[in-house]
Amino acid sequence: MSLSHLYRDGEGHLDDDDDERENFEITDWDLQNEFNPNRQRHWQTKEEATYGVWAERDSDEERPSFGGKRARDYSAPVNFISAGLKKGAAEEADSEDSDAEEKPVKQEDFPKDLGPKKLKTGGNFKPSQKGFAGGTKSFMDFGSWERHTKGIGQKLLQKMGYVPGRGLGKNAQGIINPIEAKQRKGKGAVGAYGSERTTQSLQDFPVADSEEEAEEEFQKELSQWRKDPSGSKKKPKYSYKTVEELKAKGRVSKKLTAPQKELSQVKVIDMTGREQKVYYSYSQISHKHSVPDEGVPLLAQLPPTAGKEAKVPGFALPELEHNLQLLIERTEQEIIQSDRQLQYERDMVVSLSHELEKTAEVLAHEERVISNLSKVLALVEECEHRMQPHGADPLTLDECARIFETLQDKYYEEYRLADRADLAVAIVYPLVKDYFKDWHPLEDSNYGTQIISKWKSLLENDQLLSHSSQDLSSDAFHRLMWEVWMPFVRNVVAQWQPRNCEPMVDFLDSWAHIIPVWILDNILDQLIFPKLQKEVDNWNPLTDTVPIHSWIHPWLPLMQARLEPLYSPVRSKLSSALQKWHPSDASAKLILQPWKEVLTPGSWEAFMLRNIVPKLGMCLGELVINPHQQHMDAFYWVMDWEGMISVSSLVGLLEKHFFPKWLQVLCSWLSNSPNYEEITKWYLGWKSMFSDQVLAHPSVKDKFNEALDIMNRAVSSNVGAYMQPGARENIAYLTHTERRKDFQYEAMQERREAENMAQRGIGVAASSVPMNFKDLIETKAEEHNIVFMPVIGKRHEGKQLYTFGRIVIYIDRGVVFVQGEKTWVPTSLQSLIDMAK
């Protein structure tokens, strides 16, 4: 067999210039002999593997091979083998026929011999070389080696339970006979010569494949093998759209819709083509022709290299395609527009039906309103007819109120929207004037309150109105009270005497919840207060027998803070009257006591310190303490003011004018061989003259404890003990008893304060509980109405200064320091409160 096929060019021709050159291109012969095991191969020598193309090739040095490889015979004639059509010609042939027109190739028509044709190369060819290299029919004597062995395999199988003549496996499910092989007729691929199943296979597996399916699969695979993916023609694909799909799409094509106003005058520069184009609206772009800028190139115009690969379209009409596309889009848009118009008409029908229902409701409502207005007009005309003078059935105020109640109950909407002011002026005002023509307010203060209360509910608007001309004109009841009722009140107040306050106070109390608030304020501010102020200016506390509080204080519930301008002249006149007053005159207390709860705590304390406390100090200074003959009148006069002046002021008087003299008398008495029983009684007697509140004061406690210490020192001396045996024990017992009383009193006070705090804290938030000493001082200041505030920009040793009433203090580590004459003195919280009062 010649090896000339290894030295052919890409098209199967021999290379005349270099016969020894091996071409590595894949030819048609290579493709056809791909599965041929008998094809000739060139075995590479060791020298060729080492030196490659520079190796020296010598036919004499070639090794003999078992595959029948032999040296090249140059004496044989030259033969040519047809390699079929060229690639270009094959492609042209394929492009002329479509897949649909191809003749189906059946398995019967497939060539039986896919290998290369036999070459006539001369006499050196041996027929024995037709077989496979080194191949033998080994399946004929399969297992024959067991003849020359000990049969160990058969013995092992029998030990494991194998029975000759039966299949392998637990249930003998294995095959008995060995697998048969079927020899293929030719050298083609699998299945090229029909079914290759043996008789044994058909018996064991009787299910056969469908011939039609196999044929169809074969044609499909064959067609795919022969097609060119880049240049093959495909069947046209059609896309269908239903009406529902077009409705779901629901949009109008840009080419058919009118441009928007804001986009109709936009300048657009199109640079998508080879040349720049200018459009003056987006709508012009939508009408841009779909034909490409350059025509379809002809075959003659194509470059030589492109002519082999590119294919010329056989049918290209872009204008026709464009027109067809326009028709399709126009039809789609007509369908969409028709659907939208149908939906619009349906919505219009629903909307008109709703409007019809609403119109019917409005019509029925208007008919009811007309009917109600006609009935209201009939009632008003009846009232006007009965209002005529000298009528047979004159209208009264009560009957008119019932008619208005009917209007309000049955025809509320019409009554609420009607102009009640004009209706009341025409009908109600004359009746009210006639009703109050003989009225005396101070004699019968409740006259007309019920009927006016009824008219208030009928005529007054829902909202609360203030005093203004607009509100007065819009609210019928306010106008009624101002124009009809108010003139009667003005006449009565003009004739009223302020010292006779009870009738006027009762009258205003009866009408306060009926008349408008602004009318009541006008009466109090413009009518009552000027008369009271004038009467206070004319009042003289020395000559007037009627106390001023008797005709001023009854106005407190009605006027409250309006009376504060009267307090200043009252205090001034009382101060003038007390200049020559003596504590023995008890009438001053009767005059001043009602003012204690009226005046503020600060102003009251200032008034007491200015006018009363100095007088009491002079009286207490005149007190003579005589254990043998004591006159207590001056002491009683002073202690009688205990509830009028503060405890701190009273204690200050006692410290200054009483206790020094009292302790001096005690020391004198103890130095003259006294009777300690009498001294004890005298001590207890004076202590019983003070109230518990005064005795609880620290200064008073200190003074009485000082007296006990003096008595203990006196009784501890030898002279006193010798003069009166047992006195020391009595004084010690007295001291112990007094100290125990003080302790019990303090414990009781603490318990009371704790109970008060517990009761007060039931509904109090946790934030109100004082968290530090400053908060505690602030709480106490609020309880005693004492001003507690920081002094801006003032500090002492870095501590903020505060004003506690009239006292300047600062707080350092939970201790209050009070400013003294030269230094800061620490003090207790109770002492601070007493000093501030």
From Swiss-Prot:
PROSITE patterns: G_PATCH
Name of this protein: Tuftelin-interacting protein 11
In-chain residues carrying the UniProt-annotated modification Phosphoserine: S2, S59, S95, S98, S144, S210
UniProt keyword Phosphoprotein, yes or no: yes
Keywords of this entry: Biomineralization, Cytoplasm, mRNA processing, mRNA splicing, Nucleus, Phosphoprotein, Spliceosome
Motif Nuclear localization signal positions after renumbering to this chain: 700-705
Lineage, broadest ranks: Eukaryota, Metazoa, Chordata, Craniata, Vertebrata
Gene Ontology terms, MF aspect: nucleic acid binding
Family: Belongs to the TFP11/STIP family.
Compartments reported by the entry: Cytoplasm; Nucleus
Function: Involved in pre-mRNA splicing, specifically in spliceosome disassembly during late-stage splicing events. Intron turnover seems to proceed through reactions in two lariat-intron associated complexes termed Intron Large (IL) and Intron Small (IS). In cooperation with DHX15 seems to mediate the transition of the U2, U5 and U6 snRNP-containing IL complex to the snRNP-free IS complex leading to efficient debranching and turnover of excised introns. May play a role in the differentiation of ameloblasts and odontoblasts or in the forming of the enamel extracellular matrix.
InterPro entries associated with the record: G_patch_dom (IPR000467), GCFC_dom (IPR022783), STIP/TFIP11_N (IPR022159), TFP11 (IPR024933), TFP11/STIP/Ntr1 (IPR045211)
Pfam families (UniProt xref): G-patch, GCFC, TIP_N
Subunit structure: Identified in the spliceosome C complex. Found in the Intron Large (IL) complex, a post-mRNA release spliceosomal complex containing the excised intron, U2, U5 and U6 snRNPs, and splicing factors. Interacts with TUFT1. Interacts with DHX15; indicative for a recruitment of DHX15 to the IL complex. Interacts with GCFC2.
Region annotated Disordered, chain positions: 1-21, 34-73, 85-135, 183-236
Main location: cytoplasm
Source organism per UniProt: Rattus norvegicus (Rat)
GO BP annotations, alphabetical order: biomineral tissue development; negative regulation of protein-containing complex assembly; spliceosomal complex disassembly
Compositional bias segments (type: Acidic residues): 91-100
Residue ranges of the region described as Required for nuclear speckle localization: 710-734
Listed GO CC annotations: catalytic step 2 spliceosome; chromosome, telomeric region; cytoplasm; extracellular matrix; nuclear speck; nucleolus; spliceosomal complex; U2-type post-mRNA release spliceosomal complex
